[in-house]
Amino acid sequence: MLSDDELFSSPMTFMGAPYGRPGPGNKAAILGIPFDCGTNMRIGARGGPDSVRQQSALMRRFNPTNADFDPVATLGLVDCGSVRLTPSKIVDAFERTEQAVDRIVQAGAIPITIGGDGSVTVPVARAVGKKHK
């Protein structure tokens, strides 16, 4: 019989960073915000977080020619996944996004968000602003 590790794959993360919630050793946390209701006549930005994660798999984590450190290890980077939301429910999406960013900030990590459209800046700024008034 196969073990769970042999049967199930882990979610794609940014640059292969560990998946999970930020803790004491994490200085930064990736958060996807798959939202595109702030754009008119053109949807698709909600696919941004997944696309960025897929493309980041092509990046080398350490390249001594350009940088003498591994950003994932140096930052203790963790990928929290994406905010679970329904794109058509704008108020709910913003509330959930603000709560997700708030949890990252309260854990002492810097949120690195991958949108979505530009409107997701509003709930992100609200959450960060609560901590840094």
Q: Which functions belong to the PLM regions below?
A:
Residues 1-133:
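Metal-dependent C-N hydrolase catalytic cores
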